[in-house]
């Protein structure tokens, strides 16, 4: 890497973009400092000197948000950053996906991309700056990389597409799209949307690609100026004689029939048996541990299986389980499985099954997101779990990994736009999707199961959402798009294109590919085929439950909304929270108070809600001239008695207003604790209340 500082400048969405090389992190294979507005990101690329054994590419992308970048000190006891949060993990995945397909086939060196956010301007996306930084760090390094790539954020506001919208613009945008690619094609898409049509989404993707091409050209100018020298990488060539021998054996053993097995587990067993039988022909009894040859034969077998699956799909239009290319697996769904849960939905598609369980909580049960931007209170959460038994395997039980976090977030994005507003449904909602079986498209099954759970719980959603995963197999100059891909098609195909939405439009998409990129024609066809599949799945779901239930579960908390004068909020809370804690201790309710005086009272027991409401009404009640109260004598003075109209509000009952008859001493008529009927006669400018019992006597007479 060059040791001399060089600075390159351009503009990006109306803000300055600067890329610096040669000054920082010079021991990395490649490093750049990206300045986008006031956002500053350091991106580095490092590769191991020796390749790793195995048949996968060991790429790791990290994205670290330093709290000092936003002028914050981390919370917690240690006051330092811990493991990356969900948002940072999602950004790392976002960067990984467009970069991964652009390394040479067979490259097995460990590659680590590090992105450290040093300064964060929320209106100048650190995530998109890190994507460009990752591309440039690889491009100026000696690591083989067939980039550069770039990514942009696209919004859709008042019928117009916007590149890298500001935080304020995102609040009113119908679309939050991240798209990445190189100069020739798009190779990554991630979006959440408010029922965007397929044509609107397609236009947004390629509107973003036009800006990507400009950013890629800018990066190419930097690369041409620096002229990095790349490592020489020569992929390992297969022994052609060995390949032909293994191929002949697989044909003799019936590879085609083995692949065309409906049941996933039976297919896996048949393929394992075929592999063992073929490998057995190459085992040397005198050298039974000839690992190199055995590994080579296994690798060839995997290549042949992949090629056969792709050939069957591309040439014969036959899928491993016998389906047509646009056919959806058998569907089953059910709601209300769990009597004590607030809502539940079971969705099964072929050998993929997700159980989604919904819990309703008070608004105060929100999740607080404290990142580089302003704190966010999240009141809708979707979590995704993928246990080992779902694929018939054993293994350690760990905390959610990147994949689980990513799939949970995708489901959350797909459903976020149908969740009712707080004013219409004052609850925090958490859905947990447990994948019980998996043979591909489990994230989309979790979206369908979650929609069922929402409707079972009685959540007044704006519209039901269904999800489907599309696949792609390219062969020579032709391509085949697959509807509802299973695990083998995902693993051996070229694309995993997930699309979720309502009958009227898309609410989320996510596209991962293993080839260089996709043309407009392929994406357009995939979106239309996905729409047809999505509508078919939704039709099935609506036969299970047509609309949200009219009543919530008996075990769900009930929430009552009331409004008070904002000036009275401090009276409800009390000094140091004393009053509100007394209410909570007495009734067991959860109270959430908004700045405008809206109060949400939540509890399972309606009687306790009513009691809490009564207490708050007493605290915040305003005395009115002309109103009659049964007041209690609290204090006696020479000039009259102070009576409590209701908790927190006293009035002066002057001695002259106690009776029609003349009274010498208040104590002759009243004592502390007595109850007396009084009428409010005056409230002065200072809020002091005067009452009279005499006027009531006069009116009776």
Swiss-Prot record:
Cofactor annotation: Mg(2+)
Assigned keywords, A-Z: Cytoplasm, Magnesium, Metal-binding, Nucleotidyltransferase, RNA-binding, Transferase
Residues of the KH domain: 557-616
Cellular compartments annotated: Cytoplasm
Cited SMART domains: KH, S1
Domain S1 motif: 626-694
A GO molecular-function descriptor: polyribonucleotide nucleotidyltransferase activity
Binding-site residues, Mg(2+): 490, 496
Superkingdom as given in the UniProt entry: Bacteria
Major place of residence: cytoplasm
Catalytic activity: RNA(n+1) + phosphate = RNA(n) + a ribonucleoside 5'-diphosphate
GO-annotated biological processes: mRNA catabolic process; RNA processing
A Gene Ontology cellular-component term: cytosol
EC number(s) stated in the UniProt entry for this protein: 2.7.7.8
SUPFAM superfamilies: Eukaryotic type KH-domain (KH-domain type I), Nucleic acid-binding proteins, Polynucleotide phosphorylase/guanosine pentaphosphate synthase (PNPase/GPSI), domain 3, Ribonuclease PH domain 2-like, Ribosomal protein S5 domain 2-like
Family statement drawn from the similarity comment of this UniProt entry: Belongs to the polyribonucleotide nucleotidyltransferase family.
Function text: Involved in mRNA degradation. Catalyzes the phosphorolysis of single-stranded polyribonucleotides processively in the 3'- to 5'-direction.
Name of the protein in question: Polyribonucleotide nucleotidyltransferase
Taxonomic source organism: Staphylococcus epidermidis (strain ATCC 12228 / FDA PCI 1200)
